[in-house]
Structure formats: structure tokens, C-alpha cells
Amino acid sequence: MAAKVVLDFEKPLYELEEKLSEMRVYLKSGEFDARTESREGLRGEIEALEAKVESLRKTIYKNLTRWQKVQLARHPERPYTLDYIYMMTKDFVELSGDRQFGDDKAIIGGLARLEDKDSGFSQSVMVIGHQKGRDTKSNLYRNFGMAQPEGYRKALRLMKMAEKFGKPVITLIDTPGAFPGIEAEERGQAEAIARNLYEMAGLKVPVICVIIGEGASGGAIGIGVGDRILMAENSWYSVISPESCSSILWRSWNYKEQAAEALKLTADDLLAQGIIDRIVPEPLGGAHQKPEVMASTLKSMLIEELQGLLSKDASTLVDERIAKFSSMGVWNEAEA
């Protein structure tokens, strides 16, 4: 069994949980000395420690710094695109290749059905997203979620297919950035991303983009132009990672915490700036604590957004999408 991943700020909580677990085992074992200890007394100690654990858990996760949210977004147990696809949809059929160079495993996509029995909603959708690996072998296979030009061209091919057949597009963003290797540059990495921005702005079907983990720079926005932008509570979205920003400004990664604060890259920050539309709440402690709950929450929000978008005609969707992205940012004009 793989060792439990504990982030640095989680260590005090982990230590208390370990102590609590030991006390529960001790109580069940019956090995305590009945002459000096009572079962009721031990139960009282356990209940007190349980309350302390819950209090500390809330204190930690309700007061996360921006850098701590970056750490949670990168948690290796966090659900990835395929996890969400299998938890939220049915009848997923993966589609491969860009029909020009090859099939990039860092981006996956295909047709699936999103439905809710309670409301009667049922809609075939095109789901596209970055996919990371869980271990060294799978990370090499997935290129650590860093897409090549053929990955973005595959994504665009699937989007245009969805447009042709009138299917909404859902993208799940989770990448440390587009692959920066020279071979990717030679095959037109910048052009592939730029082409996606241009084409996604004009897609005549609803497009919903969700940042589920890391949203780094062009690698993220390459599948990130949509009618609605949703963002998981403990994800991040920025033009640059905190480490890279730190290395540029301070010539060292040691200032990554300060960089994260300056970048304002959390869901709360971006909602306040009007970059995203909604925050997807996560279970206390992160999406990896209760993946099924997280997937259910996201699914409900996707269905809610789709119901509104499907009522709009193609021209309205395109006009509103372009206006949405055109209004982002601040223009400063130099005096003549």
C-alpha cells in the first residue's frame, strides 16, 4: 500500500489522527489495565480527541494560504479528468489522434452522456481534459499532463466534431503548463494554442471549462475559452506558476509563497476579478478526501449551467462568449 501523502501544513492534524487511531485500536484490544483505566474513561479521552481533531481540521482548511491551495491542487491523490469522467458520465467513448501527427496522451477526450435521473436531464456531450499519471510510469505515459501541439489539435478536432453534431463541450483543465520541449516548439506549440483560442471563441455550441487542479498559463487556456468558467475551490489558475515567478523575480524558488500571494491565483481571487463565473466547493480537506462527493457537486453544477446555455441560439452564445473574454483585464493607454 502506498504511503499516505501528508502536506507540510497537514502534519499537526496527521499526528493527532494517528494518535486517535492508536487509542481506538487500544480500546478495542482490551489490553488496557482495568485496575488503573476504565473503558468509559478511555472513551471519554477518545471523544475529546475527536473533537480536537475536527476543530483543528476546520481551522487548517478554512484558513489556507494561496500557496497551500497550490499544494492541494497538486495533491497526487486528487481526482483527475478520467476519474471525473467515470464518476459523472456514462457510456464514455474515447476518441484519439489529431489526424496530423499523433495521439497525445496528456489530453484525452471523447463522447459521453451526462444525465440526472431526478430531473430527467440527459445530454450527450464532448468531454476533453488534461490527464496526469498516478506514478512514474503513468506520468511518463501522460507526460505529466503537459500537452504537445498534437494534444491541442486533437482537442480542437473533437470540439469541431461536437459543433458539427450539436453537442456541448466540457473541458477539464489540470496542467502544470504546455510541454516546453524544443520538439513541441518545432511542431507549432504556440500556433496550436493560439488556434484553439480563436476557434473556441467561435464554437456554435455551449462550452463549459472547469479548472479541476492546476491551471498554468497557455497550457490551461488552450482548452479554456468557454461560455462558463468554473473553478474548483482548491485549484489555481495563473499565467505562471509560483515557483517560476519566484525564479524570475528573485532568482530563486525560495519565494514561491510570496509569489503565490502576489499572483492572486486562487478561485476566490479570480471570481472577484471576474475571470471565472463560479467556484465548485470541495469537501473539507480537498477533493481527494471524498472524490465521489466532489464529482457529484461538479456534475450538478454542470447540468445547471448546461440547462441555461442550451436555451440560447448559436449566435447569442458566440456573441456573449466573445464579449465575456473581451471585457477581462485592464487597459492602460499612454498619454499622447
From Swiss-Prot:
What family is reported? Belongs to the AccA family.
Task: Record the organism.
Answer: Chlorobaculum parvum (strain DSM 263 / NCIMB 8327) (Chlorobium vibrioforme subsp. thiosulfatophilum)
Q: Which residues form the CoA carboxyltransferase C-terminal domain?
A: 48-308
Q: Does the keyword Transit peptide apply?
A: no
Top-level taxon of the source organism: Bacteria
UniProt entry keywords in alphabetical sequence: ATP-binding, Cytoplasm, Fatty acid biosynthesis, Fatty acid metabolism, Lipid biosynthesis, Lipid metabolism, Nucleotide-binding, Transferase
Q: Return the PANTHER family for the record.
A: ACETYL-COENZYME A CARBOXYLASE CARBOXYL TRANSFERASE SUBUNIT ALPHA (PTHR42853), ACETYL-COENZYME A CARBOXYLASE CARBOXYL TRANSFERASE SUBUNIT ALPHA, CHLOROPLASTIC (PTHR42853:SF3)
Cited InterPro entries: Acetyl_CoA_COase_a_su, ClpP/crotonase-like_dom_sf, COA_CT_C
Assembly and oligomerization: Acetyl-CoA carboxylase is a heterohexamer composed of biotin carboxyl carrier protein (AccB), biotin carboxylase (AccC) and two subunits each of ACCase subunit alpha (AccA) and ACCase subunit beta (AccD).
HAMAP family named among the record's database cross-references: AcetylCoA_CT_alpha (MF_00823)
Q: Which pathway does it take part in?
A: Lipid metabolism; malonyl-CoA biosynthesis; malonyl-CoA from acetyl-CoA: step 1/1
Please verify whether the record's keywords include Cytoplasm: yes
* Pfam families linked to this entry: ACCA
GO MF annotations, alphabetized: acetyl-CoA carboxylase activity; ATP binding; carboxyl- or carbamoyltransferase activity
Chief localization class? cytoplasm
Q: What is this protein called?
A: Acetyl-coenzyme A carboxylase carboxyl transferase subunit alpha
The biological process GO terms on file are:
fatty acid biosynthetic process; malonyl-CoA biosynthetic process
* Disulfide bridge positions per record: none
Q: Which gene encodes it?
A: accA
Cellular component (GO) terms are:
acetyl-CoA carboxylase complex
Q: Report the catalytic activity.
A: N(6)-carboxybiotinyl-L-lysyl-[protein] + acetyl-CoA = N(6)-biotinyl-L-lysyl-[protein] + malonyl-CoA
- EC numbers listed for it are 2.1.3.15
Q: What does this protein do?
A: Component of the acetyl coenzyme A carboxylase (ACC) complex. First, biotin carboxylase catalyzes the carboxylation of biotin on its carrier protein (BCCP) and then the CO(2) group is transferred by the carboxyltransferase to acetyl-CoA to form malonyl-CoA.
* Localization per record: Cytoplasm
Q: Which PROSITE patterns match?
A: COA_CT_CTER
